[in-house]
């Protein structure tokens, strides 16, 4: 009863004070009720000193009302609060919510939802239980929510790379929400968090202690996160200490719910306990109350500036609850955005601060709470160490599961970066590391160490070892930046940190050597390394003789002095002695039209093949020479391709690289002998310098003045030319060369390593961690994890294989195979040359002339055709019309022939024109001049062109002698005209004079001796109409000089026919000629008679001349002209000499063109006579040559044309002139215009 009177009397006094204020003053004041959740000394002192004089700096007058609630009975609390709201016009309530007042906070939240009165909690004790708050409640909290606390706790775990942890909770309200928040944060993070275990224990009074002990002993996590109340936390830590989970080897993190008051932590709390509180955790109760009242006052002031009046006081609890009035809703919105004394008090719709400032605190060794981190605007700033693991002298506490690791920055093994400026943390794949600051540590200084982020090859190895061996670690950078060296008896660097037990382990680019192994223990090497040398590329210039650099001088001499000359002489000698080429007429080699393949042309041919030039050359004809030329062409392809492939490497701007063979190279051992002196150095206080100092003292003495402070400085010196070579660990140099911008730095020998060793992890002497670390490293090596890490960290875009492609000359050894090929080809050519002569001079005469060996003849002809080709007879079909638009002699002759064909309808002339046209077209396409048949006479008394002579028309021969018109003689005997065949010429049977000539008869027939031929006059020839040829032999082309109808070789232009097919062939050719077109004479133009008029017309039949003889075996078969004799078409030479008649406008006189065009007519056409003509009766040496040739006991049929390849010398025209020939020879074929082209 007495307990209930106290609050009633207090309420009565408050109401009396409110009544005495007066109406006028109360309209401008804001009434704020301050409710204390306990009645301790601090609360009592604050209540007595809390007056309106404490809030004079606020924009509105404040009337504070203090209420103490120390009764946990909900009904009494509701009665007290509702009485206050009903008696006084209260604008808001400030509530001091400790961790023991969760029930009062819940009741106030209910009252706010009914009366819409703003309630502001200032201590944060009710933050956990009011998640979420009641609908319509205006309860605001200066504390942080459980979700915000979890975010900071996970940031602490991330800061120290504590990815594996366990969660232990009690049955306190909110534990399910806590577990849900842990899983949500772990799943949303990019880090691979590992929740090892989750335990829910009954930690209240009378709970099962044995079960709690058993479950705690099963936990195997170095980091534990707990959720419970203050009283439950005392029980939990007491049980955990008995289970061995409390100590330096374990880390505990709890939210502020488990702390309660931070004034006096319980004795069961372990040293190093980490928690998260608000930034007001060190503020006094009076300061907290002042902040709460200021938020309400500033919200009311903002409301009055907008609406001109203060917001209405809160309603009564007895009134019927209804919707929130617009004025109360507007006042609540003004309270959500308030700034006071530079701090942002913006609240979320849930009633919590949007951007709270939190503090990470830890229990130190003096049993005091110490701030070790700060969370501000999403960034965590931590102090190292996070818990007091060090004494005042920074000596570490012995810990069986936590290691202090020292390292040294050196790319790519340890790379140090600054934290993310936006979040203040480290990005993924990095580990927080620290570097000790130079200033003295003080309690107010939060940064005795500089926070950094470390990554790299060694950092990844450390993270994998921590997971496998299961340990936690602190990572810090050594202050002197050295690996470790003994200076005046004191070790520095990472070796000194481990040796003096300031660190449990050291990892980095730490080389294992004998001196270090005496004082510390090393693990198995995880990276193979040694000593290597790095140099820089320097730009050079292209030498003027760079185009000669692909081959050595010996190769050039061998190529052009020896090979080219020897092969050229070889080809010429083979061609010279070849039985089918040069050897056929050595005495005529220098005459016009004869063989002209000389040694100069042989050299020119081989030179053109070497450089693949399109120049005019003359190819050899011998088979052996052609084989040699083909082999030389293959040699030239290889030679030129090798030269071209290597030329680019020498023609570009060469880059000079200092090449050294090793540490024993003369450039290192005698650097002063170089000009300028060779400059090289290393980073001191390392294993590289120790190795050089121990083995090469003179070298070490020279390099001391060129030593560099760090690897980066050395690389800069190399690029700037201050250093010629840098000696250091091979693994580091290979990485730097691969990552160098521009790929200017290279390691010699593609990363050649000297004094091979490895990198290891340094541990204290006789450390119990050594065996576990070694086994873990061997497992990583066996699984290929280290190879994967090397691929990620130790490889670069500039590979040494590409950087050190150095050009070298091709020596004799490189080109020996090509020269060997030439030697073998020359040997094989000699064998082919000997076999060719053996077959030509010996074996071919031993083959019997038998019809059973016809297949050998066919086989021989086939092989011969493959190498030399056989001129095939053109088809009897009409060839395509030639191009008559060209301004050339050939085009003019073709035009003339076509015009002649259109003017006449004589079948014989028409067919002759057809054959001439096709022959000219064939020779024009093949670009080949047919060989002549026989020599033609020259006129002894030449006259002017176009003038008639007594002898009639002369033959179209005689070189430069123009044709002379002679008087025709009456015909004596008609000659049989054979069927005209295309591309084949035949002579008419002639009579010879009765003159006798001395003859030398051989085994193949009568021949004229050389002396007798020389005795003949130059113009001593048979009559022109008795010869087969139209020009002298001296002007023929250089074809072989063979007798008439040579035997045994078969003529080139004769196709092989059996004896039974000769007559069939002749009939078939006659039929083909008969089917040719024959224009009628009616279509003849009237100007033809004037163009081709002669004084002595020819008889209307195809006849020979006076010496023509009728063959007994053949009847004369002559064809008559279809038109009058006055319109007779003249012969080809007559047409050329006659001139242009009047009335023919298109006729262009080109006398010199015609004369030169018919000087090399190689064929004659006529019936083959089996008896000599009458004119040969006086020349018995011609009888043997007049017989038709017999091929393999076969006599060729009639009407066959042959090439005149006899050995007749020039005979004067007067020899047969005595017989008196009535008329000149009729020329039926124009064979060649090659001289004109």
UniProtKB/Swiss-Prot annotation:
Motif residue range(s): PDZ-binding: 1235-1237
Outcome following mutation: residue 550 to R: Changed NMDA glutamate receptor activity characterized by increased glutamate and glycine potency
Claim: Glycoprotein is one of the keywords in the record: yes
Catalytic activity: Ca(2+)(in) = Ca(2+)(out); Na(+)(in) = Na(+)(out); K(+)(in) = K(+)(out)
Site label Functional determinant of NMDA receptors, positions: 612
Any GO MF annotation of the entry: monoatomic cation channel activity
Residues annotated as transmembrane: 555-575, 623-644, 814-833
Residues on Cytoplasmic side: 576-601, 612-622, 834-1237
Glycosylation sites: 70, 73, 337, 438, 539, 685
Intramembrane runs of residues: 602-611
Subcellular location: Cell membrane; Postsynaptic cell membrane
Extracellular side: 20-554, 645-813
Feature: compositional bias, Polar residues: 907-925
GO biological process, one term: protein localization to postsynaptic membrane
Disulfide bonds: 82-317, 426-453, 433-454, 743-798
Tissue specificity: Detected in cerebellum.
The name this protein goes by in its record: Glutamate receptor ionotropic, NMDA 2C
Naturally occurring in which organism (per UniProt): Rattus norvegicus (Rat)
Lineage, broadest ranks: Eukaryota, Metazoa, Chordata, Craniata, Vertebrata
Gene that encodes it: Grin2c
